């Protein structure tokens, strides 16, 4: 389950990067990226 969360997070980051490539920088995409990274750190901290 923890690995599944991390995988979903990585997919989110890839989607954000792809979004940036096609639409340029967007504050919303940046925010999602930060939230995702924070979630990854939290999962690592828990384990």
Curated annotation (Swiss-Prot):
Identification of the protein by name: IgA-inducing protein
GO cellular component terms, A-Z: extracellular region
PANTHER family, per the entry: IGA-INDUCING PROTEIN HOMOLOG
Gene (name only): IGIP
Keyword Signal: yes
Tissue expression per record: Expressed in Peyer patches, spleen, thymus, liver and mesenteric lymph node. Expressed at high levels by dendritic cells, and at lower levels by T-cells, monocytes and B-cells.
Induction (record text): By CD40 stimulation in dendritic cells (at protein level).
Keyword Secreted among record annotations: yes
Top-rank taxon: Eukaryota
UniProt-annotated location(s): Secreted
Organism: Bos taurus (Bovine)
Primary location: secreted
